[in-house]
A protein has these predicted regions:
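Structural motif
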Residues: 47, 82, 128-139, 188-193, ...
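Beta-rich, blade/repeat-based domains predominating
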Residues: 17-35, 71-72, 76-84, 94-120, ...
């Protein structure tokens, strides 16, 4: 969805090959005018949206009632597509760039400052979901001049001191470091933000008293990190700037 200056809204993508998207989650812009986005299943699950109709991946046994809590006339549907990543070309064409087989349940994604690398986070499946589900890690791909991806590698498994610091959102700074929001569950002191060098080495942490869902750099100098947590919005000034075109 793109909001225009006259307050109208333009739908950029709602389907792929005639099948409706799941629940587009995170999006990044490319200097060539394209938009790259992840399409995980979370909006089609009980705890974040409404479950599939009976027999769907998030309601395989058919015991959940997707109509509860919905307006009159709501018609439940079923997931139609795997959890993939897509690219919206400036022409409007939609291309599949990362498949569910490569990165199941994709979530946050980010380009390196020179746009030669794409980082994609894979999060775990939701309660009751029967899709493949991710492992709470992040992959990195090489990006060619024609926007083809190759050489997938695991960037990090996000295990710190034996604690799984589950990743969600990711942003890159001008030095190529990756800032990743962290969900460590009940492990006190491990939720917040982890910071990684391009080599995959952990170089910093920001500890928050809540699970951190997503992050972004902002402010007049793009040196302030905003952190959206479970019930709060945090901000901190950093000694770097968020990467962006121009």
């Amino acid at each position: 969805m793109r909001y225009e200056h006259d307050s109208t809204a333009t739908v950029l993508a709602d389907s792929y090959n005639g099948k409706k998207l799941n629940s587009p989650n995170d999006v990044v812009a490319h200097p060539d005018g394209s938009y790259w986005f992840t399409d995980p299943p979370y909006g089609g699950q009980l705890y974040e949206g409404e479950p599939d109709g009976a027999g769907g991946p998030s309601n395989a046994a058919g015991k959940l009632n997707p109509r509860i809590g919905q307006p009159a006339g709501f018609v439940p549907g079923k997931r139609e597509l795997p959890t993939n990543c897509y690219r919206i070309d400036p022409s409007g064409r939609i291309d599949l760039v990362v498949s569910e087989d490569q990165v199941p349940d994709p979530n946050g994604l980010a380009f390196s400052p020179d746009y030669t690398k794409l980082y994609v986070i894979s999060t775990g499946k939701g309660p009751g979901d029967t899709d493949p589900g991710g492992k709470g890690d992040m992959s990195v791909f090489d990006v060619s001049a024609d926007n083809k991806l190759a050489n997938q590698k695991r960037f990090s498994d996000f295990m710190i001191d034996g604690v799984k610091c589950g990743p969600d959102g990711v942003r890159c700074d001008v030095n190529g470091n990756l800032w990743v929001s962290s969900n460590a569950g009940r492990h006190v002191g491990y939720s917040g933000v982890t910071v990684w060098a391009p080599s995959g080495q952990l170089i910093g942490r920001i500890r928050l008293p809540e699970v951190c869902g997503n992050i972004c750099f902002g402010g007049p100098k793009r040196n302030r990190l905003f952190m959206a947590a479970s019930q709060s919005l945090y901000a901190v000034y950093t000694a770097t700037q968020g990467a962006a075109p121009g």
